[in-house]
Amino acid sequence: MADVQMAEAETFAFQAEINQLLSLIINTFYSNKEIFLRELISNASDALDKIRFESLTDKSKLDAQPELFIRLVPDKTNKTLSIIDSGVGMAKADLVNNLGTIARSGTKEFMEALQAGADVSMIGQFGVGFYSAYLVAEKVIVTTKHNDDEQYIWESQAGGSFTVTRDVDGEQLGRGTKITLFLKEDQLEYLEERRIKDLVKKHSEFISYPIYLWTEKTTEKEISDDEDDEPKKEEEGDIEEVDEDKEKEGKKKKKIKEVSHEWQLINKQKPIWLRKPEEITKEEYASFYKSLTNDWEDHLAVKHFSVEGQLEFKAILFVPKRAPFDLFDTRKKMNNIKLYVRRVFIMDNCEELIPEYLGFVKGVVDSDDLPLNISREMLQQNKILKVIRKNLVKKCIEMFNEIAENKDDYNKFYEAFSKNLKLGIHEDSQNRAKLADLLRYYSTKSGDELTSLKDYVTRMKEGQKDIYYITGESKKAVENSPFLERLKKKGYEVLFMVDAIDEYAVGQLKEYDGKKLVSATKEGLKLEDDDEEEKKKREEKKKSFENLCKIIKDILGDKVEKVVVSDRIVDSPCCLVTGEYGWTANMERIMKAQALRDSSMSSYMSSKKTMEINPDNGIMEELRKRAEADKNDKSVKDLVLLLFETALLTSGFSLDDPNTFGARIHRMLKLGLSIDEEEAGDDADMPALEEEAGEESKMEEVD
């Protein structure tokens, strides 16, 4: 084929990342090299989708080749396998850019995944499926013709460069692409008819275009001896003699073998979504899912349904076992639901078809009611599409509930897609209550198991009116939080919301099953006293600590909004709570981590903290006595500042000035170890412990 290239060849270097990828594909041993055929057929199908879509608005686009097909041609003589499609083809610029000089966003991620031990069959998910050809081929030639350009030939042995030549004398395609693989000596199995058929059945049976295989057919023919000694050559192929004589009716008969070639259709299945669900096997769903998504694993769940009535459409939805590497990449358009209109593929990244939070659901929707020539702009206004979307969301939630019936499957699903459900709680007010049923959390009573809100409600203690939760960085960070002390003592269960997105979700999910969701870290936590006597005692305690609260507020100034006696802590000396409508400590941490945050919003939403003190704690009792004896006692001030900074940490906030806090702790240690401050040589560098007073204060030991 290369001999007919009369035009001058241009040589291009592969982009560095693509070169690395090719090197990795060629020099590493992979057991499942067979996936190359799936990838190349999938690319051919995409090219056919594009030209079919273009032809909806301009019929002349199909003039050069009206038939849409994929053809496979094994050539045992030349050891080549060709994949031919009558798709959109590539112009010269596309050829240079798409096959070598511009790396896709997934190139680097795929290499990293491969080096981390991922399966090579993932290649299609990263948009670099073409290069899988080099798993079996030592050289690849791509001949392509686009309607708006001449025919070109791309050729490479993957040695760091490729050539592109204008095809002057080669066989003209009309329109489309022909990929010729020059197979390695140890990969000649892919020229066998049986092997190719098996691979198409396994990976590409549900491609919606006919796949034809150029097959060899041998037939035996009986001729009598008195027919021409020299058998005529049939148009179809060669004839070879079989040395076998047979007497029949007194005449000598001969058998000859006749070899002919023909195109054989090898994907005869009609679109799977048009068949009845009860007729389809589990294996067929798995095969369709893999051909649809390029996933190498089976799906986790499937929902196959049709909607009839005023509006009719059929759909198959799948939930994968894993989240893709770029699930929340905003630059990537989600293209997981393919939209067909009367069996004609229209588009695969229709944002109006499914909400963003369900972007991980893959599948096919085929409608009879949408117009064939629908444009993106029309889709946004289309009422039919809004009804389809509503139905898809409903069916997705049904499918998730079906997964939830199997605990192990649901754990897999929740680990991969819990963020999506929580994003749904935040965005989809209509389905918020249904999505809330799907949430799972660890809690003070669930141990290592996740619990649902429904199960939490069934375990609520008598007299408990609200659902309690705490947000934080991790389960470990919240399970021993001072905020939980009284709740635990009263036997109330508290949910641990330790995912950053929980803060956003719970902000929208105000209640569940008629019960309010109440944060353990915010103001307004009302816990009823067990009896009147206890209530009376608490009131007396509060009264006796009123003066200390005032002194602490004077010392801390505008660091806190107010200081009150706590109802929520039992053992800790104090804690810091936030306003009912402001950010929690955890939300403040999340917002500080946002590089592009609006700082004016931060100052508005990070509400003033309220310091709550525990009247039953020994430290607080001693502090009260000292403050009452001498409210100007400098050790009281130092202790209050130290308690405040410690409470910041235990309540989940960060310190504005960790150095001062460190110095305060060191001072405390010296007192405990009876080290005289005058003797410590490095003390000169220590910051003053009180910001307001310039003079140094010496701490007294607290019993």
UniProtKB/Swiss-Prot annotation:
Name the residue ranges of motif: TPR repeat-binding.
Answer: 699-703
Functionally, this protein is described as follows: Molecular chaperone that promotes the maturation, structural maintenance and proper regulation of specific target proteins involved for instance in cell cycle control and signal transduction. Undergoes a functional cycle that is linked to its ATPase activity. This cycle probably induces conformational changes in the client proteins, thereby causing their activation. Interacts dynamically with various co-chaperones that modulate its substrate recognition, ATPase cycle and chaperone function.
Species source reads Ipomoea nil (Japanese morning glory)
Q: What is its main location?
A: cytoplasm
Does the UniProt entry include the keyword Cytoplasm?
yes
Protein name according to UniProt: Heat shock protein 83
Q: In the UniProt record, what gene is named as encoding this protein? A: HSP83A
The record's section on Gene3D superfamilies has: 3.30.230.80, 3.40.50.11260, Heat shock protein 90, C-terminal domain (1.20.120.790), Histidine kinase-like ATPase, C-terminal domain (3.30.565.10)
What InterPro entries does the record point to? HATPase_C_sf (IPR036890), Heat_shock_protein_90_CS (IPR019805), HSP90_C (IPR037196), Hsp90_fam (IPR001404), Hsp90_N (IPR020575), Ribosomal_Su5_D2-typ_SF (IPR020568)
Q: What does the sequence similarity comment in the record state about its family?
A: Belongs to the heat shock protein 90 family.
Q: What is known of its domains?
A: The TPR repeat-binding motif mediates interaction with TPR repeat-containing proteins.
Where along this sequence does the record place binding of ATP? 43, 85, 130, 376
